Amino acid sequence: MAEATRALGYEDNHPIILFAKQEYANAEIQLQYYQTRLEEYDLFWKKRYEEYPVATEIWLFIKDQDWNDYVCAGILGNIMSEVGGGTLNIQYWLYGSSYYGICQWSKGYKNQVWGTDLETQCQFLVDTIEYELDTFGYAYKKGFDFEDFLELEDEEEVAKAFAVAYERCSRLGIPKRQSNATKAYDYFVS
């Protein structure tokens, strides 16, 4: 803008040129701020990928669904109990005599998830969660459904709701799933 006003014959001390210079300086400051933030963001996620690549991949996959951090942490807290040994070291390929994968799906889902990669399992989770919560949400709370689940704002409550309505596991393990959810929340959000 300053160059254009000079071309029109304005002096360097004209208000339009001074304004353009100030706007350019402000833009430089903002650019530097956002470049620094981007570098910090990249470093944050690089560190997480290096330390816990599978947990990070799951977190980002479910975050891409526009689910809040509490929902993501609650789901991941359950996965940590299923195939992480209570840690973020998720081993998605684990199976038992009757169960497989990040949610230890039963043989009834063999054709959909058994022997599949992480992305396929994450997509299966996303594809089935609404039906499961709409169908079995009552086990958590009367009238509870998928939309209610997405509105929860406490990772421990999300972990409990997911455990009883999606995983349908023993209630004895719920406190561990809840503490895992808090670990996941603290790791990925804090």
Regions found by a protein language model. Name each.
Residues D69-G86, K160-A163:
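Short, functionally critical alpha-helical segments immediately adjacent to catalytic or ligand/cofactor-binding
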Residues E151-S190:
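Active-site or metal-binding loop neighborhoods of secreted/extracellular toxin and effector enzymes
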Residues T56, L60, L76, Q123, ...:
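Solvent-exposed, polar/charged alpha-helical surfaces in well-ordered, non-transmembrane soluble domains
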Residues A4-Y70, I174-S190:
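Intrinsically disordered, low-complexity
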Residues R37-L60, D64, M80-D154:
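Peptidoglycan-targeting cell-wall enzymes and recognition modules
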Residues M1-E3, G84:
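Catalytic cores of peptidoglycan-degrading enzymes
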Residues E23, E82, E167:
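Acidic-residue sensor for enzyme active/binding pockets
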